[in-house]
Amino acid sequence: MPCLEALARLPLPRTLGLRVPEGFAYYALYPEAYLDAAAGFAREYRPGRCIVVGLRSIGTALSAVVAAELEAAGAAIESLTLRPRGAPFARRPVLEPGLADRLRHRRDAWFLIVDEGPGLSGSSFTGTAELLIGLGVPEARIALFPSWLPDGRAFVSERAREIWPRLRKFHVPFEALRHGRELMRGARDLSGGLWRALVCPDGARWPAAQPQHERRKYLHEPGPATPNPVLLKFAGLGRYGVAKRDFAELLAAGGFAPPVLGLEHGFMKTAFVPGRPLGRRDLGGALVATAARYVAFRRMNSPVAEKLRLDELLGLVENNVRWGLGADWLDRLGRLDVTPLFRDVPAVAVDARMLPHEWIRTESGFLKTDGVDHFDDHFFPGPQDVAWDVAGFAVEFGLDSRAADEFAGAVGAALRDPSLPARLPFLTLAYVATRLGYASLAASSLGATPDGRRQAKLTKRYAWQFRRAVLAWEAGV
């Protein structure tokens, strides 16, 4: 093992920071799909030699899967990984001269580009393909292995829109995988916002969704095999799913979430409890008391406790004031000197989805849904001060300042955290800044679709709330 021996002699750091493989953790991306896609490519083209290019980070693992399947099919394999660089919507790898010479004019091999995605721009895939074409690789000898198959017309990158349709692509959808077929057999698809038709038949009252960001979910309705309805929602492969299941079981044991029935192929099974999604009109003493207990329970039982990244919050608020309200509003914001308030405050597993429709009224009270995903995804806020959820509940249910202070006081008293109410004004700024940014980007991405219009409406509401929050901050309220 000369390579491992050489590696062992290097001065390695004491710790390494690893990226979460988003597809495996959040988006029901199964390595088996790439095995099947590679097998399909091998059957169709019977390649003699393949250069398998994984795009980092997750493309490293996925390209190894593709390479293994093709090697088993008899192909000679060369593997390498590249990291596309540059502006977010114009990314492409940069090769050192020796590697570029090695790849130049390789007409004897297929070049297979492997990654999850494409994302909004499509530029990682197409930028890599364009690089290879520039090295003399025939376009007809390049194949892409993506995690989904858009037509490319909506890509932000103009070059990606031009190149994507010309390239061969090999993809096997989740629905075609064996365990995908098993999970979906007899189930109703609730993914991509389809759950709204089940719980809110009046389409005019549907809450806004960003379908591209929703996790896969299915409902098994009552039948011979399932006497009671069961919800299956993707929680993550391996340890990611196990951690979500464990926390969901804890919330259910506390009486705040539906019972957990198991974890299978990365999908968590929970009881589908009959109930009605809430609206702002449902705000009342019983709900406020339940929400206060829920927020406190999460803080006391959080599976994570990290150092709060206050600089990120400060930067987010300032950037979104400048972007969302205008640079002149920065003067109203003033100097955000809040560090003393947050000294020794940990970042914990907040809910981060305290919107009314995420609560349901049942025969026995209130339950919180969607409670284990959003402190651990690739959107803001991640693990955060527990007061984030206090601010979220107050903003989304429209609490006035007095009611918000009372709610914060109740949570603070339960946690013996007397400074929590004092942290609420700044976290209200940060919460609304985050929601404004998310809704605005979703509206832009979804365009003239019904959800695009819903997100545009939300953007206006959050902009109004953001202005109010900045004015309250300026006045010291």
Per-segment meaning from a language model:
Residues M1-P211, R276, D282-L283, P303-E306:
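PRPP-associated nucleotide enzymes
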Residues Y45-C50, R107-A109, N228, G315, ...:
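A short, charged/proline- and glycine-enriched loop
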Residues L112-I113, V348-V350, L367:
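Residue-level marker for buried hydrophobic side chains located in beta-strands
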Residues H171-F174, R361-E363, L367-D370, R461-E474:
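Short, structured interface segments
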Residues R181-C200, A327-D328, A456-G476:
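Non-catalytic membrane-proximal stalk/linker segments that position and tether the catalytic domains
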Residues P201-G334, P356-E358, E363-G365, T369-A433:
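Conserved ATP-binding subdomain of kinase catalytic cores across diverse folds
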Residues P346-P356:
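Catalytic-loop of the protein kinase fold
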Residues A391, D405-G476:
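Helix-rich C-terminal or lid/interface subdomains of diverse kinases
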